[in-house]
Amino acid sequence: MREVKPGSIELDFVHADPLARPLPVPELGGSVDLKRVQIGRTETGRPWALRLLGGQFLAVGVQGAGKASVLWSLLRALAPALRSGLVRVYGIDPKGGMELGQAPELFHDGPVYSNGAAAVELLEKLAEETRARAARFRGILRGWTPNCGEPFLLLVLDELADIIAYQTDRKLKERAAAALQTITSQGRAPGVAVLGLVQDPRKEIIPFRNLFTTRIALRLDEAAQVDMVLGDGVRARGGGAHEIPESTPGVAWVKEDGRRDPVRARAFHVTDTNIIELVHYVTGTSATVHAFPELHAADGGEAA
């Protein structure tokens, strides 16, 4: 149900949930349009596409909600651009590499597996590059283009709160927050984007979440958290992320700046095999999986 105007509402009658089953990932290859990077499907059957060029992205959900589906669907969709060097990805995984460590080859110089000095230095490096690019583009380009001679930069942060909220060193925490705010507020034109993944949407955890132009609410614990992620009044306009069942990881409500109503969508289901395929595709390597030979007893003996 949506309020179209005062005194007028619009109703959708759904007879079956088109997002109830996992969505298999498309084949690797093809071209990439950074203005429409498909990572899944909406409940109306349309592609769920992120406008990576000019956007900043925040995905919030409880453990098991499917944040990894958003991450790996995006990286698979970007595979041709990663392979050609058009897009360069950096990563910080303070959980010791439990997520990004599945495919470290995809990340420039490898992911950082902590929330300490190395993570902060990477954030500050990208913040400086954001400012430097803006200076180089000034008077020449209005913004990043595929032909500008520099790669589009994507920074993946999993888990974001460990970097800007749970860091116990006050100076590192302040430096990390300052650098990240520079990237998210100034990265649009220079071609620098952030995908932040987090479980806790409270304002004290992410005080500058308004700088993320696309906010993705996967399964949440409480109704109040929906408006924390998507904005005031979005839950009343249908964005019931707190009602997403545990059986549908990857289902989310998505709110983009400039659009009044949220969209319900589901990210592709990316398996471990799909991630291995992605690494081989991007790095130009190949691998064949062979069945382990069966061992048979010989001359009446027993197999070891």
Language model segments and positions:
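P-loop NTPase catalytic phosphate-binding loop
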Residues: 3-10, 20-140, 150-230, 234-238, ...
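Periplasmic polypeptide-binding modules associated with outer-membrane biogenesis and secretion
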Residues: 143-144
